[in-house]
Design a protein with these regions (language model features):
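Rossmann-like dinucleotide/flavin-binding elements
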Residues: 125-202, 312-357, 420-424, 434
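Glycine-rich beta-alpha-beta "Rossmann" dinucleotide-binding loop(s) and their flanking helix/strand
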Residues: 74, 105-119, 279, 286-313, ...
């Protein structure tokens, strides 16, 4: 064999080994994605709640760029050579998958919502089937701070176009329900155009951000806040965002009427009467800038009414040398558990009704796994809370019922979105948009 033949033989051999190695890795990854897809379908986690990537399978070339671009991890995978949604519940709609696709084969949106009984039917201007009642923010199905701010501005601009002769002393141009990013944006736009408006919320300004644990990092995209200016960074901590909301309120004298939980909206002579727990308001238009979390979901177990039971963690540093139980397995639960486990002397336990964490971000999954391996956090999967005592909690799993010492219980079982209220008002979900007037 000549020297050139030997060189070609070695080249072909090395190329074959490299190709075979690559083929095996790709094959393993795709088999793994197929398995994850089937598991997600069986658990019901394949279906997204908000906006999600809609993949054009005719354009998709199976390059995996979208899979690698997703910052949440685990949302997308490659099955049968095409990109597909694996864990839709993890998707929050960043849209980086669409930006990364080299063939423009992905759009991020809500898709066909005709069968979605949790998404209200909205016009292009975010108006419901009830003329003058608008929805802005995640209640309409679009997550992310940027979307909320943009929609808050958009709906009030549409109200301005259709505003009649103006308000009277007993009637507002618009009442804005919810003081999160969407509500604050709507209020700033109303102030910018000298509308007579009222901004109300059942808690303080901040919306869903108030529920986040201390120093939680929130991803967003650059967006312009009416009157205030641009949010230019891609990441903010909870505290940074709340400082911005506080600065906005002070700078523009934006008053939020707190402790006003909306109970009903009724039509009154082409106006709307809003009833809260403590007040009534009359308005020509209404902006519902409510979050999807709504009222915290309860376990309905004995002892849940004790003062040591809470549904949100504001500052982990205030809890030290305590026996703490976290109930739930989503990102909020995991982040709270990790924050508390980092405090001196805490003994942190998680009780989760499923067999493993299925909804959390990849970064959280890696961090919590490490802390469990290091025995900084104890987890009881496939378990439920039976009873909450003064100094202990009774837990039941498939094998036994047992008690653990306990000082505090944090329940992160999700929230009950305000869908019954919206049905009561007359807002339609699914089907075709029809006017009731």
């Amino acid at each position: 064999m000549s020297e050139s033949e030997i060189i070609w033989f070695i080249f072909i051999l090395i190329s074959g080994v490299v190709f075979l190695t690559y083929f095996i890795q790709v094959r393993r990854r795709r088999v793994k994605d197929e398995k994850r897809k089937k598991e997600a379908e069986s658990l019901g986690t394949d279906k997204p709640l908000n906006q999600y990537p809609q993949i054009d399978y005719y354009r998709c070339i199976g390059c995996g760029a979208c899979v690698r671009a997703c910052p949440e991890g685990g949302v997308l995978g490659l099955v049968h050579g095409k990109a597909t949604i694996i864990n839709g519940l993890k998707c929050v709609g960043h849209g980086m998958c669409a930006e990364a696709c080299p063939v423009n084969g992905i759009k991020v949106g809500l898709g066909d919502i005709k069968t979605r009984d949790d998404i209200p039917i909205l016009s292009a201007s975010n108006e419901t089937n009830l003329p003058g009642i608008y929805i802005a923010g995640e209640l309409g199905g679009l997550a992310l701070i940027k979307n909320a701010i943009t929609q808050g501005n958009k709906v009030v601009n549409d109200i301005i176009k259709n505003l009649g002769n103006g308000s009277s002393e007993d009637c507002f141009d618009v009442v804005i329900v919810g003081a999160g990013p969407a509500g604050l944006s709507a209020a700033l736009t109303a102030k910018q155009h000298n509308l007579r408006f009222m901004l109300i919320d059942q808690q303080n300004a901040g919306g869903t951000i108030l529920q986040y644990p201390r120093k939680k990092v929130v991803m967003t995209k650059p967006v312009e806040i009416p009157l205030f200016g641009w949010l230019k960074k891609h990441e903010y901590t909870k505290e940074e965002l709340l400082d911005i909301w506080e600065e906005i309120q002070q700078k523009f004298q934006l008053k939020v009427k707190t402790n006003e939980k909306l109970e009903n909206i009724e039509k009154m002579n082409k106006k709307y009467k809003l009833t809260t727990k403590s007040s009534t308001y009359l308005a020509s238009n209404v902006v519902l800038a409510l979050g999807r979390r709504g009222t915290p979901r309860k376990l309905n177990v004995p002892g849940e009414d004790k003062s040591k039971v809470m549904y949100k963690l504001l500052d982990a540093e205030t809890y030290q040398n305590e026996d703490i139980l976290i109930v739930g397995g989503g990102d909020s639960a995991v982040e709270a558990a990790m924050g508390l486990a980092r405090q001196p002397g805490n003994n942190v336990t998680i009780s989760y009704r499923k067999s493993r964490f299925v909804r959390i971000k990849t970064r959280n999954e890696q961090l919590i796994s490490r802390m469990i391996d290091d025995r900084k956090i104890t987890v009881f999967f496939d378990s439920n809370i039976v009873q909450i005592g003064d100094r202990d909690v009774t837990i039941k799993n498939d094998q036994e019922e047992f008690s653990i010492p306990n000082s505090y219980v944090f329940i992160f079982a999700g929230g009950e979105p305000p869908l019954p209220l919206m049905h009561k008002i007359g807002i339609k979900f699914g089907g075709e948009l029809e006017s009731d007037f």
